[in-house]
């Protein structure tokens, strides 16, 4: 397996030349465009890795699956999905268009920015510090990584430049989707996107979902139903507005982030973490997508 991963990383590294690192958030543009790495964690405890698997990066939108889990644990499935839908939007992740033009004013799903901001507003706590502290501790628990922390520079960059996110949040407040303090919800959201980890971190997160919400030590954190909800939304909405194409090409539940990460889940088998900050036009890791496509074909991982 290790040799296969090494071979696939080298084969697909050429695709990094065809994309670009995210540059609309200060600090993200400092990533090495040519970087590509992968980490695989199996349910029976084996670990395999190749390439730039140890490079730290901010998980960005991969955090949306973590905040969704915590929001459901805090409030229950019925409440969360009364505020946020489950349908693909077909629009870019930062689009505001359907919020106003759709007959239903709630965000289409929790994987687009508007939906994730609404989800962040549902995390329990007396203020944004307590809410984010709970979220970070929950992330450490399910990734089994106590070194997870906030990249403060990127958080400030997110907060200083996220004007479209501010506009979405205030619109959601006006529609009654966000019930609490708007700025607290945004602070939690910007901070969760700025959590820093490695390919191993998101590989372990993938393994947690592959094991239906059970940690390596056997402790159950999510119900089986909750784990299924998260994995289903990863398939239908996890790769932004190329989720359908990715499902056809790769066929495993995955969630990407503009920091270059992709967290993938092979149910009952393994979690996969990929890092490649050179992005395609949809905001997904370009070489990372090709790498996962090859790995899925080689190991027959497609769930369909």
Curated annotation (Swiss-Prot):
InterPro entries found in the cross-reference section: Beta-lactam/transpept-like, Glutaminase
A single GO molecular function term of this UniProt record: glutaminase activity
Enzyme kind, highest EC tier: hydrolase
EC number: 3.5.1.2
Gene Ontology BP terms: glutamate biosynthetic process; glutamine catabolic process
Record flagged with keyword Hydrolase: yes
Binding site residues for substrate: 61, 113, 158, 165, 189, 240, 258
Coiled-coil stretches: none
Entry similarity comment: Belongs to the glutaminase family.
Complex and partners: Homotetramer.
Protein name: Glutaminase
Native source species: Fusobacterium nucleatum subsp. nucleatum (strain ATCC 25586 / DSM 15643 / BCRC 10681 / CIP 101130 / JCM 8532 / KCTC 2640 / LMG 13131 / VPI 4355)
Lineage: Bacteria, Fusobacteriati, Fusobacteriota, Fusobacteriia, Fusobacteriales
């Amino acid at each position: 397996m290790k040799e296969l991963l090494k071979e696939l990383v080298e084969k697909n590294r050429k695709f990094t030349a065809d994309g670009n690192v995210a540059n609309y958030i200060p600090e993200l543009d400092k990533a090495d465009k040519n970087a590509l790495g992968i980490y695989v964690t199996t349910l029976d405890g084996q670990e395999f890795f190749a390439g730039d698997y140890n490079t730290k990066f901010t998980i960005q939108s991969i955090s949306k699956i973590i905040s969704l889990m915590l929001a459901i644990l805090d409030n229950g499935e019925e409440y969360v999905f009364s505020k946020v839908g489950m349908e693909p939007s077909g629009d870019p992740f930062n689009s505001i268009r359907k919020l106003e033009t759709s007959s239903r004013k709630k965000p289409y799903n929790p994987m687009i920015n508007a939906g994730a901001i609404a989800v962040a507003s549902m995390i329990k706590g007396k203020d944004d510090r307590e809410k984010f502290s709970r979220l970070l501790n929950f992330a450490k628990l399910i990734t089994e990584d106590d070194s997870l922390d906030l990249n403060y520079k990127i958080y400030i960059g997110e907060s200083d430049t996220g004007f479209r996110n501010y506009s979405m949040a205030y619109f959601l407040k006006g529609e009654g989707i966000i019930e609490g303090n708007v700025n607290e919800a945004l602070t939690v959201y910007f901070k969760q996107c700025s959590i820093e980890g490695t390919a191993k971190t998101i590989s372990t997160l993938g393994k947690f979902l592959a094991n239906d919400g059970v940690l390596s030590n056997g402790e159950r954190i999510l119900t089986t139903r909750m784990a299924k909800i998260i994995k289903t939304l990863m398939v239908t909405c996890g790769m932004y507005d190329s989720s359908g194409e990715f499902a056809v090409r790769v066929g495993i539940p995955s969630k990407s982030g503009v920091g270059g990460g992709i967290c993938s889940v092979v149910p009952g088998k393994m979690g996969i973490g990929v890092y490649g900050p050179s992005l395609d036009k949809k905001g997904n890791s370009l070489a990372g997508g090709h790498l996962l496509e090859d790995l899925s074909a080689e190991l027959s991982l497609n769930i369909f």
